[in-house]
Amino acid sequence: MEEYSLRSQVFQTIRDDILKGKYEENDELREATLGKELGVSRTPVREALRQLELEGLVNIIPNKGAYVTGISDKDVHDIYMIRSMLEGLCARWATQSITAEQLDSMEETLCLSEYHTSKKNYEKLYELDSLFHEQLYEAGGSRILNHILSDFHDYVKMVRKATISTSSRSVTSTEEHRAIFEAIKEKDPDKAEALAKEHVKHTIESIQAYGLEKIL
């Protein structure tokens, strides 16, 4: 169990570093260097790199090494288009499965988001944006859908952080979250699904307007 936990931690750390932009595309990930940085042997690092290759984030070239693949412009666009459909489904399901406790938690997150939007506290807004989506995925009541959407959400961390830092998008994003929440609270599946889809589509539009080349 401890060995599995260590491998999982090493994988998650390297994965997060790639998604946060610590490495450039084609940077070499040396097992010995990573092991020293993380305080582990080369074995869990090697296993983590193999797992990252399966996710498409790393390219392992035999007898040469492991290199960062990263996320391309097309990857970002594809992720948001897929997320649009799946978050719509999640919001639809949430109208039937959300609990009173989950509604209260989402309401609290929204109130905090609205406050920090007015204060233009973008760092806190990024955290609250992530929290709202986590709560939405949980409210959908599907472990599988939650896992898929959480992975997609992680893949575009850098992009989300950049766009939420613009005042116009932070305001509209918070307003859209509120509308999705109200539709779920009213148990209106068609409205909740449509609003959730539009929210994600508006996000990719703001990303394109901002310029992906400034982020990736």
Predicted ranges, named:
Residues S5, L103-D104, S168-V171:
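Short helix-capping and inter-helix turn/linker motifs at the boundaries of alpha-helical repeat units
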Residues K120, S168, K187, A194, ...:
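Bacterial carbohydrate/catabolite-sensing allosteric modules
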Residues M1-Q96, Q102, E138, I204, ...:
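Short linear motifs at protein or domain termini
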Residues L54, V58-N59, F152-D154, S168-S170:
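Mobile beta-alpha loop/short-helix "lid" or hinge segments that flank ligand
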Residues T95-Q96, G141, S165-T166:
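Short helix-capping/hinge motifs at transmembrane helix termini and TM-loop junctions
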Residues K157-S167, I204-G211:
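Short amphipathic alpha-helical interaction/hinge segments
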Residues S5, Q9, E127, T172-E175:
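A generic alpha-helix signature
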Residues I79, A100-K161, E175-A183, K191, ...:
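Conserved amphipathic alpha-helical segments that form helical-bundle/coiled-coil interaction surfaces
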